[in-house]
């Protein structure tokens, strides 16, 4: 009886191990480690160490995103909902800042006019490096309802580079939360130390 239980347990363990191996192999493409590092087949210990360094730096940046509020129109109300206690963005490390010198993310929320474009560019230039931009709403993405107005910029990506576009008029706070989570995934895939090593 005892030997039959041991045999059944061993078979169950083997099945579990084989299904876990299949799951891990099917999730990651060939040659990419399961940790998500983009270094393919590191050939030296230095490359491996730099890949782990990138993982640690990306984890720190991903866990402490400090956005700058740049509300220009009605999308700013949804950005305020996003910052309110209902969504509790502090658990993701999102802490709003009022100064561009302390922020590493800017939410462009609303219609960007031609007069506001130089101010937006100046604020973007004042942010320290490793900076990201989330364009929020139809007006910031491409002009929206005011696309054909003479005084409206047809998308903030004509002035500053945009990382994530959040569609909607206005987008909900949940959509903005999804955009922040997508930005965190993008930060996770960064590989600055590895690219520096390859130069």
UniProtKB/Swiss-Prot annotation:
S-S bonds: none
An example molecular function term from Gene Ontology annotations: quinone binding
Chief site of localization: mitochondrion
Annotated Pfam families: Oxidored_q6
Keyword Nucleotide-binding attributed: no
Reactions accelerated catalytically: a ubiquinone + NADH + 5 H(+)(in) = a ubiquinol + NAD(+) + 4 H(+)(out)
Keyword Ligase among UniProt keywords: no
GO biological process annotation, one example: mitochondrial electron transport, NADH to ubiquinone
Compartment annotation: Mitochondrion
Family matches, as SUPFAM superfamilies: HydA/Nqo6-like
Source domain of life: Eukaryota
Any single Gene Ontology cellular-component annotation: respiratory chain complex I
Cofactor: [4Fe-4S] cluster
Cofactor: binding details: Binds 1 [4Fe-4S] cluster.
Positions bound to [4Fe-4S] cluster: 74-75, 139, 169
Stored InterPro entries: NADH_UbQ_OxRdtase-like_20kDa, NADH_UQ_OxRdtase_20Kd_su
UniProt entry keywords in alphabetical sequence: 4Fe-4S, Electron transport, Iron, Iron-sulfur, Metal-binding, Mitochondrion, NAD, Oxidoreductase, Respiratory chain, Transit peptide, Translocase, Transport, Ubiquinone
NCBIfam families in alphabetical order: nuoB_fam, PRK06411.1
Family: Belongs to the complex I 20 kDa subunit family.
Description of how the protein assembles with itself and partners: Complex I is composed of 45 different subunits This is a component of the iron-sulfur (IP) fragment of the enzyme.
Main function: Core subunit of the mitochondrial membrane respiratory chain NADH dehydrogenase (Complex I) that is believed to belong to the minimal assembly required for catalysis. Complex I functions in the transfer of electrons from NADH to the respiratory chain. The immediate electron acceptor for the enzyme is believed to be ubiquinone.
Protein name from the UniProt record: Probable NADH dehydrogenase [ubiquinone] iron-sulfur protein 7, mitochondrial
Gene name of the encoded protein: nduf-7
